[in-house]
C-alpha cells in the first residue's frame, strides 16, 4: 500500500477531502502536519495543505484559548519546518493547558527532560561566551554583528542532544567566523581589501597576512588558529582529515561572497538561475555550515560522507536554496535602502520584467519546491546515514524560523530575544 493511500481514505470519489473532517480540529491539525512532508507529484498532499489551512483558520475563533494558540502556532511554524527545542517548549505549554486530554506523567517527563538539557546548554553557552570574549574580535571589529548567543541558539537548532556537545562547540565557533566574514564582505571591506583577503584565504597560510589591513589580519589569524585547534583535537581520534573538507568549504564561501562584492561594485544584476542561484548555493553558507556540523560528530561521519557532501548533492542544494531565498525576502527592502548587491528579487524582476509582488510570489514557490526536494532527500534511502542528513535538514529549519517574518538574526533584539530566553533561560512553570 502506498503512503498516499492513507490520505485517500479521507477523500470522496471525486478526490476532494471529506467535509466531515472540518469538525475535527485535532484531526485537521494532524493531517496538516503530515502533509508538510510532501514531495513532488503528490497533489493529494498539496490539496491537504490547502484544505486544512483554510478550515483551521476558519475554526480559530471558535476554539478554546489553548487550542487556538496551538493551531495558530502550527499554521505559522509547522513541525517539519521549525526548531525542535522551540517546538518542544511551546508544545509542553500547550499540553499543560489541556490537562484533561493529555497524559500528565508524560508531560512531567517532557518537562524534566527539557530542564536537564536546558542546564547543560546554559553551561555550554558560558564556555562559548568565554571563548568569544577572549578572542576579542567583537571589540576589534566593531562593524561586525556581535551575536554569539544567537549563534549558539542557531546551533541548538541543528542538534540539541547531549552526545553532540563537542559538535555544538565547533559549529558555534564556525558560525561566529562565518558571520564576521559575511559582514566584512557585505558591509565593510573595499573591493581592494576583499581581493587581498580572498587571496589570503585561498592560500590558507599565516605568511599570507603581509598585505592585509590590520583588522583583516586579526580576523585571518583568528580564523586559521581556530581551524588549527580543531585539527589538533580531532587528530587525537584520527579524524583530522575532516578539517580539510571544512577549510575547502570556507574557501568556497569566501569565493561566493567575493563574487557578490564584484557584482555590487560593478553595478551588475546577475542572471537569476545560472549566476545568482548558482552562486547562492555557497553564499547561503549552508554548505560550509553543513560540513562543519559533522566535524565533531561520531564515526558515521566518514571520509566518504565528507566527499559526498562536497559534491553539492541535491539535498544540500535544496537546503541552500531555501536559506538563500528566505534571507533575500526578509532583507530585500533594507538592502535596497542601503544600495546593496542585487538579491534574487531584483534578479527575477530584471530578467522576467516582473513586479516586486510577482517576484515574491515566484520565489516563495521556488522555496516550496525546494522543500519538496529536501523532503525527498530525507525520506528516501541515500548514500549517507540519516543521522548525517539531520543537520542539513535542521539548518534549513533554523533558516525558516529565523527568516520567517524578518531578519531576526540581524535584528535579534526583537522577537528572537524572547525565544532564546524561553529556550535557554526561562524555567518551565509547574
Swiss-Prot record:
Positions annotated to bind Mg(2+) 3: 335
Note accompanying the cofactor annotation: Binds 3 Mg(2+) or Mn(2+) ions per subunit.
Pathway per the UniProt entry: Secondary metabolite biosynthesis; terpenoid biosynthesis
Binding site for Mg(2+) 2: 182, 186
Binding site for Mg(2+) 1: 182, 186
GO MF annotation terms: magnesium ion binding; terpene synthase activity
Residue numbers covered by motif DDXXD motif: 182-186
UniProt keyword list: Magnesium, Metal-binding
UniProt xrefs under Gene3D superfamilies: Farnesyl Diphosphate Synthase, Terpene synthase, N-terminal domain
Cofactor(s) needed: Mg(2+); Mn(2+)
BP terms from Gene Ontology: diterpenoid biosynthetic process
Domain comment, as recorded: The Asp-Asp-Xaa-Xaa-Asp/Glu (DDXXD/E) motif is important for the catalytic activity, presumably through binding to Mg(2+).
Job description of the protein: Sesquiterpene synthase involved in the biosynthesis of volatile compounds. No activity detected with geranyl diphosphate (GPP) and farnesyl diphosphate (FPP) as substrates.
Family indicated by similarity: Belongs to the terpene synthase family. Tpsa subfamily.
Name of the protein in its database record: Sesquiterpene synthase 15
Lineage: Eukaryota, Viridiplantae, Streptophyta, Embryophyta, Tracheophyta
